[in-house]
Every structure is written in C-alpha cells, then in structure tokens.
C-alpha cells in the first residue's frame, strides 16, 4: 500500500525529467513528455496557486478556483491510475512534501537536496518553485543562496505578497489605534489639569479680594489659608503637583513633583 511520501519519493526520483520536453536540457534528449509521476509537482504548484486566489478580491476569483480544482483533479486521476490509491491534494503541498525527504531513522537529508527543506534553487531549475518570498522575484534573486537555504518553504504561506498586504493593513490599524488612545488620554489629562489649575487660581483670587481681610470684621478664620491648605492634599491625592502653591503658602514640599 502506497503512502503520500512513497508517491513524493517516486516523483523525486524522476524529478530531473519533470522539465521535459526541453531541448536546452541534456537530460531531456529523446524524452517526449515528462513522467506521469511529475503530477505530484503539478498538484503542489496548483495548491500554491489556489491558496493565492483564495484570498484575492479579483472578480475572476471563483472562475479561477474552479479551473484550478479541475486541473488538480486531472493530476489526481493520473496518480490514482499509477498507484491505485486516492491521494488528497492537501497532502501534496510543498511544506508537507519536504517532510518526506528526510530519513526517519537516521535523520539524513534525502534526494538531491542539501537542506532538509526543498531548496528553492533546485525547484526553480525544474520549473516547480514554490511561492516566492514577499517582494516577489526581485527579493528572491536579491538574497544570497545561503540566506534562501535557511528559509523553510512553509514560511511562504505567511510571506505571500498576495495576502501580506492584509496583514500590513491590520498592523497599521493596530498601531494607529494605540497612537490615538495615547494621544487622547494625554490631551484629556492636560485639559483636566488645566481646569483644576484655573479653579485653584480663581479660589485664591476670591479669597484675596475679601474686603474684610486683616480687619476686625475679617471673615476668614484665624489662619486665612486654612481652607486652601486643606484643599491641597485633595488635589495631590488625584496626582497633581502642588509645589508652587505649597511654596507660596509656606508649606513643606509635597508628593507628585
């Protein structure tokens, strides 16, 4: 009984012929068509294309997805005729196929690949490269081979240029939301502090305008600043700095300054 990995390994054994017919490739001389085992790569490539179309706003989305599903079914039929088993297209994706190329017992890297992940350069030569990194082909050719070989194929799912714009928009909205909340709270705090300062100044001014202050008819208590001194701790309890007022009234320094 064949497994998905058996099918993938068979395809890898024939991978040097999967780009045929191509007169420019020496291994394709006399080869009129690619081996049917290469249908595995067709399905993997179609799965990537399907993933991109699934998250687009293009008006042709439904039509494209329908055609892709039909193409996948054709290759699935080919594989069914070869191996006599029903393979799920979801099992034939680049990031799942790469698991089949490692020896389960020794951990040795399998096939023609020097890395445990399907190397992009090798797949590119076969015409079956996975979805490129964000930035498309420009970024793909700009990065050194050593860097590309350290990036798992599965990461392409999240670095896909077709859907990355949505993640960037969401991130931008979150940043703007946080910035708005911080600015709003700061302005509210300043406005509230300003109103309290105005209220305090008005209170002092009203007290200083008492016509009977320092006379026998003085309406103030023995300490003319008693009410004000009692009020300062109230504002300090709310987090305000009352250093200037404490100094003016001859009081010791307080908190929040």
From Swiss-Prot:
It comes from African swine fever virus (isolate Pig/Kenya/KEN-50/1950). It is a multi-pass membrane protein. Disulfide bonds: none annotated. Keywords: Host membrane, Late protein, Membrane, Transmembrane, Transmembrane helix, Virion. This is Transmembrane protein C257L. The keyword Amino-acid biosynthesis does not apply. GO terms for cellular component: host cell membrane; membrane; virion component. It comes from the Viruses. Induction: Expressed in the late phase of the viral replicative cycle. The keyword Acyltransferase does not apply. Belongs to the asfivirus C257R family.
């Amino acid at each position: 009984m064949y497994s998905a990995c058996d099918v993938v390994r068979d395809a890898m054994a024939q991978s040097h012929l999967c780009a045929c017919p191509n007169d420019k490739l020496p291994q394709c001389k006399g080869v009129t068509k690619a081996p049917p085992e290469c249908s595995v790569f067709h399905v993997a490539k179609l799965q990537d294309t399907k993933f991109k179309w699934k998250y687009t706003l293009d008006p042709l989305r439904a039509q494209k997805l329908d055609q892709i599903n039909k193409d996948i079914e054709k290759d699935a039929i080919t594989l069914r005729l070869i191996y006599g088993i029903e393979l799920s297209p979801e099992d034939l994706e680049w990031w799942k196929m790469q698991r089949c190329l490692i020896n389960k017992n020794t951990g040795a890297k399998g096939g023609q690949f020097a890395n445990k992940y399907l190397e992009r350069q090798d797949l590119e030569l076969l015409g079956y490269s996975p979805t490129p990194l964000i930035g498309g082909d420009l970024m793909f050719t700009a990065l050194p081979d050593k860097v590309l070989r350290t990036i798992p194929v599965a990461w392409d799912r999240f670095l896909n240029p077709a859907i990355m714009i949505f993640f960037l928009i969401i991130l931008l909205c979150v940043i703007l939301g946080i910035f708005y909340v911080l600015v709003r709270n700061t302005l509210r705090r300043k406005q509230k502090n300003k109103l309290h300062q105005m209220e305090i100044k008005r209170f002092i001014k009203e007290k200083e305008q008492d016509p009977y202050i320092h006379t026998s008819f003085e309406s103030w208590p023995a300490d003319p600043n008693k009410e004000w001194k009692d009020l300062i701790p109230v504002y300090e309890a709310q987090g305000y700095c009352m250093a200037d007022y404490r100094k003016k009234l001859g009081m010791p320094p307080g908190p929040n300054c």
